[in-house]
């Protein structure tokens, strides 16, 4: 199955190079030169994932993400920020607004492809699990309540970040991150981070918190 991606980048040379690389990897890729053009394309066509720069004319990446999240049919499209804005505060802002991943330029194209495949796989599993939930029994994951901080940490754990990296992004101590991860393991009745990630994806936990 070939997935449809949108690349939002006002640097035409860079956007063309990324597009060609992703096409070689088997993806369909459309290019938008700014956030406004991207928003119009998203309303017109179906995309499985959007890769967006942040600093752009007319509408920047943050504004684009905000607009997407306000429309039901577009709200769940995974968005990756691919940008030179690599400061911790910028990453925190992006994650708090609902971006699914963050890569700083210059980046390894193989890492971008791995992130894309991981997010599409996660989204595909979430969709499949939604269709299977027909039982009258209330599973554990439907009874779970996660605090905003637990939600933030769970998202970053699923993205593959280490406790140290999470601590930097959330401006907290590694010890605090360890405590939150331990609490997540207890709440989900899982033994380690790998099982926690599998449980969260399998049970569509991200869409329930």
Curated annotation (Swiss-Prot):
GO terms for molecular function: DNA binding. InterPro entries: Bact_response_regulator (IPR050595), CheY-like_superfamily (IPR011006), Sig_transdc_resp-reg_C-effctor (IPR016032), Sig_transdc_resp-reg_receiver (IPR001789), Tscrpt_reg_LuxR_C (IPR000792), WH-like_DNA-bd_sf (IPR036388). One of its GO terms (cellular component) is chloroplast. Residues 139-204 form the HTH luxR-type domain. PROSITE patterns: HTH_LUXR_2, RESPONSE_REGULATORY. It is found in: Plastid, Chloroplast. Gene3D superfamilies: 3.40.50.2300, Winged helix-like DNA-binding domain superfamily/Winged helix DNA-binding domain (1.10.10.10). Signal peptide: none annotated. SUPFAM superfamilies: C-terminal effector domain of the bipartite response regulators, CheY-like. Keywords: Chloroplast, DNA-binding, Phosphoprotein, Plastid, Transcription, Transcription regulation, Two-component regulatory system. Coiled coil: none annotated. The modification 4-aspartylphosphate is found at residue 53. Residues 4-120 form the Response regulatory domain. This is Probable transcriptional regulator ycf29. The gene is ycf29.
């Amino acid at each position: 199955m070939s997935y449809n991606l949108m690349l939002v980048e006002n640097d035409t040379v860079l956007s063309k190079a990324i597009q060609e690389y992703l096409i070689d990897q088997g993806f369909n890729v459309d290019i938008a030169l700014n956030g406004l053009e991207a928003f119009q394309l998203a309303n017109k066509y179906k995309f499985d994932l959007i890769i967006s720069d942040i600093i752009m004319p007319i509408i920047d990446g943050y504004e684009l993400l905000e607009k997407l999240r306000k429309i039901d049919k577009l709200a769940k499209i995974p968005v990756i920020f691919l940008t030179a804005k690599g400061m911790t505060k910028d990453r925190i802002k992006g994650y708090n607004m609902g971006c699914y991943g963050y890569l700083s330029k210059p980046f390894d194209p193989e890492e971008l492809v791995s992130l894309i495949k991981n997010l599409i796989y996660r989204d595909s599993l979430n969709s499949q699990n939604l269709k299977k939930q027909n039982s009258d029994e209330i599973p554990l994951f439907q009874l779970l309540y996660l605090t905003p901080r637990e939600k933030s940490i769970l998202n970053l754990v699923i993205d593959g970040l280490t406790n140290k990296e999470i601590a930097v992004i959330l401006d907290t101590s590694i010890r605090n991150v360890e405590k939150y991860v331990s609490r997540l393991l207890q709440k989900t009745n899982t033994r380690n981070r790998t099982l926690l990630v599998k449980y969260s994806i399998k049970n569509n936990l991200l869409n329930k918190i």
